[in-house]
């Protein structure tokens, strides 16, 4: 197909202004100096996400599908949704569990790897809620589930991701600190903490409080201050009660920052729950690395030595809120979530006609998965002969509060595994949430706060920039129900600005850049199919391509 030059101006806005003004307007088009070239069959696409099972079947009926395709969107990106809900993705319901002590795959547990061998048609796929979760809620959980850190049950626990330990990264654990944050909802007086450790526990850690308003949403408006007695250099595990300061301190947010693990395993004969009761001769190394906490308690110690806990311990969203750096993707069959919604099965996706037969951008789960499962997924797709354009690695790591060095460490492990299947595959990410400004995180040792700067730095320091074939992010510029017509004038600068931000952060100017989800608002996207949205859409796409973008994907197709 003939390459089409992009008009080097926000032309639709100019037309709108012309229609609103009595004064004559002149639009100059110089086709001899295009700012970009694009091929519509590669550039103008749409996304398919997790939806109701009933909707999947209805939307793929020929009359409905024909109307969908008539919209004109060309390539499709398959969106990865289970990561937003802190779930492990069984992209293939057939597969094997790492722990087969129950003598059958169906009754196994541990780490699941989908079968790479095509057999029965995969029509739907589902997520499994992770039982070692440490986050009460994030931007994708929809207030479903809860943290095991304040659930009131000492037989459950949070555990960090084993793939972020030296065993897999090849780097000191101090370079990938793991953390949990407690949000007290309001400022309260604190001088003591009690930590009920599981194994492995932290040998070295510090307990800190935040000096600003919100360390999750305003990461540069405050600092983490270590309590005067909050440094532990030789932790012993079990249940530790620590007097953090001589006098109570007024705080709202408290963080435990862990830098050295005991790297110890639970004695299977002493295990108090089924998660850890495994045959000691078949012990999985992943169960013995990282950090694990059964329950957290925070409050004050009175002069008589009594500890008074102020946290709310419930197995629901009313618990004291906690956040965690990562989650161990260990799970078992009983953790299957709701089956009313599903990711479309790969075989249904590629044979239904929704892709038009064009190569599709496919995802792999990464934040809550294993590299073996990701590699098996790609092997399956290749054995089926399904065309793949790009592979997007993980979903919205920024919305999961993951530090860039942790994402990068996982990225390289997954890239290695996938490229063993096919070295020619083009991988990318990080599929940021739709934002209009640079994504910032707590400063590193050098004071750097830009997520993208630190991600790119990590790849360069490890000599692996070649594993990043494209850069992806989402674009949802406006809040729902608050989009006056005047905001149409803002869009060209919004998308131009954020594109320039990524380049300023170190994304190479010649690296393909994709907006892999885009609409007016993430909160109410389907309601905007009107004139306002049409005008915005044309301006948004034109401005992004004018800024050098490679492709956009409307969210969403079905």
Ranges and model annotations:
Residues 95-186, 198-201, 221-222, 229, ...:
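Disordered, acidic Ser/Thr/Pro-rich linker "stalks" and the adjacent N-terminal cap
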Residues 25-58, 408-411, 415-417, 428, ...:
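N-terminal module-boundary/linker segments of secreted carbohydrate-active enzymes
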Residues 18-21:
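N-terminal signal peptide c-region/cleavage motif recognized by signal peptidases
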Residues 175-176, 199-300:
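Trp- and acidic/polar-enriched beta-sheet ligand-binding modules for extracellular glycan
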């Amino acid at each position: 197909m003939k390459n089409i030059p992009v008009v080097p101006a926000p032309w639709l806005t100019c037309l709108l202004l012309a229609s609103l003004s009595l004064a004559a307007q002149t639009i100059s088009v110089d086709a001899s100096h295009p700012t970009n070239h694009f091929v519509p069959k590669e550039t103008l696409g749409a996304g398919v996400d997790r939806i109701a099972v009933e909707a999947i079947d209805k939307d793929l009926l020929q009359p409905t599908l024909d109307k969908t395709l008539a919209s004109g969107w060309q390539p499709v990106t398959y969106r990865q949704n289970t990561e937003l809900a802190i779930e492990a993705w069984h992209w293939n319901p057939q597969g094997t569990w790492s722990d087969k002590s129950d003598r059958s795959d169906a009754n196994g547990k541990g780490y699941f790897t989908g079968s790479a061998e095509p057999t029965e048609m995969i029509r739907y796929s589902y997520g499994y809620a992770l039982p070692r979760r440490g986050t009460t809620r994030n931007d994708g959980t929809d207030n479903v589930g809860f943290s095991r850190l304040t659930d009131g049950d000492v037989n459950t626990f949070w555990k960090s991701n084993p793939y972020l330990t030296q065993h897999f990264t090849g780097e000191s654990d101090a370079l990938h600190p793991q953390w949990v944050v407690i949000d007290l909802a309001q400022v309260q007086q604190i001088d003591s903490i009690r930590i009920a450790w599981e194994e492995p526990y932290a040998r070295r850690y510090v307990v800190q409080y935040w000096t600003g308003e919100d360390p999750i949403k305003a990461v540069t408006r405050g600092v983490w201050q270590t309590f005067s007695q909050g440094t532990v250099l030789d932790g012993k595990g079990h249940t530790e009660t620590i007097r953090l300061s001589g006098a109570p301190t007024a705080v709202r947010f408290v963080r435990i920052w862990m830098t050295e693990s005991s790297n110890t395993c639970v004695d299977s004969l002493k295990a108090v729950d089924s998660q850890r009761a495994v045959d000691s001769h078949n012990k999985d190394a992943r169960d013995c690395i990282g950090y694990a906490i059964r329950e957290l308690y925070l409050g004050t110690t009175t002069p008589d030595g009594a500890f008074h806990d102020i946290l709310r311990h419930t197995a629901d969203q009313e618990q004291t809120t906690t956040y965690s750096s990562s989650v161990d993707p260990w799970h078992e069959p009983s953790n299957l979530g709701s089956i009313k919604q599903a990711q479309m099965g790969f075989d249904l996706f590629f044979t239904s006609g929704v892709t038009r037969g064009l190569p599709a951008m496919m995802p792999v789960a990464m934040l809550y998965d294993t590299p073996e499962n990701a590699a098996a997924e790609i092997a399956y797709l290749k054995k089926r002969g399904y065309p793949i354009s790009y592979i997007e690695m993980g979903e919205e790591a920024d919305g999961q509060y993951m530090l860039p060095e942790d994402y990068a460490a996982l990225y390289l492990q997954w890239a290695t595994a996938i490229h063993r299947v096919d070295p020619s595959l083009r991988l990318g990410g990080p599929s940021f949430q739709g934002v209009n400004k640079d994504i910032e995180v707590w400063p590193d040792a050098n004071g750097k706060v830009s997520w993208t700067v630190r991600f790119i730095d990590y790849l360069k320091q490890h000599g692996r920039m070649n594993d990043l074939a494209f850069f992806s992010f989402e674009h949802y510029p406006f809040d729902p129900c608050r989009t006056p017509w005047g905001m149409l004038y803002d869009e060209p600068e919004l998308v131009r600005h954020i594109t320039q931000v990524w380049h300023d952060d170190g994304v190479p100017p010649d690296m393909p850049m994709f907006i892999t989800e885009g609409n007016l608002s993430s909160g109410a996207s389907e309601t905007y199919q009107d004139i306002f949205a049409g005008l915005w859409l044309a301006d948004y796409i034109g401005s992004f391509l004018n800024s050098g973008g490679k492709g956009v994907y409307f969210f969403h197709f079905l």
